Amino acid sequence: MAGFWSKIFGNDEKPSSAQTAKDRLKVIVASEQGLGRRLSQDKIDQMKKEIMQVVSRYVRGVDEDHIQMQVRSEANIEMLEMNINLPEER
């Protein structure tokens, strides 16, 4: 698990494939239970704010505009897709 976090937030090694992918973190939560019916836009907005607060503890310069969340369907499975564009390291 430590390797996962070091890939996301960096370490002293050469740039990883995550760096090559422009420091983009993508998380997908999939469900056959119908996420769209259970997650209102208000709940998605609240999740976005809470996730931003957690990411901001570890990465400077992340704001709400860097986080995109959407519910989409694919092959009878609804997914909550979240993209976080991390700012360039300075």
UniProtKB/Swiss-Prot annotation:
SUPFAM superfamilies assigned: Cell division protein MinE topological specificity domain
Disordered: annotated segments: 1-21
Biased composition (Basic and acidic residues): 10-21
Presence of keyword Cell division: yes
Keywords from the UniProt entry: Cell cycle, Cell division
Any Pfam family the entry gives: MinE
GO biological process: cell division; regulation of division septum assembly
NCBIfam families: minE, PRK00296.1
UniProt record similarity statement: Belongs to the MinE family.
Function of the molecule: Prevents the cell division inhibition by proteins MinC and MinD at internal division sites while permitting inhibition at polar sites. This ensures cell division at the proper site by restricting the formation of a division septum at the midpoint of the long axis of the cell.
Protein name, per record: Cell division topological specificity factor
